[in-house]
Amino acid sequence: MTLEHVDTDYHLEHFLTGPLLPDREYLYRRTSDVMVETVAELPPGRVVDVGSGASQELARLAQLGWGAYAVDPSPHMLGISQMTREETKATVHLVRAIGERLPFANASVDMVACQGALDHFADRGAFMREAARVVRPSGRVVISLHNFEGLATRLGRLLHPLARASRLHHCAEWPCWQIPPDHTFKGDWPTVRGLGGPWLQLERAYGVSLFCQVYGWGHLLRRLPNGLAEGLLRRADRVAYGRPSWSDVIVSVWRPVDAAAASS
C-alpha cells in the first residue's frame, strides 16, 4: 500500500465544521488530555503519533521528554504540525507516511498513538499489524475513536423526528449518529474490542464525554454560566470514563500479543 491508495489532501476544514459549541470543545480538549496522560504513564521514550493532525499532543509530550514523531500523509496537516512546532518550540519530527506502512524498524517505538484518525485509514487491520510490529514488547498502542453507538447517537436518532418538526433541527450541523463520508468504517464498542486481531491484546479502555452534539445540548451549555456548564460536562465525563460503550469517544490501550502472553 502506498500514498496513492489514500486521501493525502486532508485539511482541518474537513474536520472543524460548524460552530465549536461547549460540548464539542470539551470533547476535543478532554480527549487530548486523556491521550497525553495515557502515553505519559510510561517513562519517556519514543512516541509515534499516526494521523497526527496538528501535533498538539506530541508537542506536550516532547516537552515531557519524549522523542516525538508526527506521521501523516497530508502535506497540509504536516504544515500545521510545523506551525505547532514553531509556536511551542517543541522538538517534533515530521514524517510523511501512511499508517498502513510505517517507516520505523521492528520494536523501535515505545508508544504508538492514533487520535481520532483510524476511521480515516484505508485498512485499519494493516495499521494495527504495523503498530504491533514497530512497538517494543514493553510498549503500548493507544487509540481514540469516535463512538457512533454511544448515548449521544442513540438519543440523536430518537429525537430526530421531533427536532425536524421544531426549531431544534438547526442545533446540530451534522446528525451525531451519521457517519461522515470520509470515514472508512463505523466506530463503536464492539468494533474497538475487535481491532487488535492476532497482533495486539486489549489491556484497558475508557470513555470520554457524554451527549456531544445531541440536539440542543451544546446551545444549552453555551447559555449557562461557564462554571456550571463545565461542571455538567465533567460529571458526564466521569460517567463515560467507566462506560466506554456509552461514551462519545473510546480510548483503548493495547499491548503486543507476545508481550501479553509472556506476562500472563
Identify the residue ranges that each predicted region occupies.
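A C-terminal cap/extension of S-adenosyl-L-methionine-dependent methyltransferases
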Residues: 163, 190, 194, 204-264
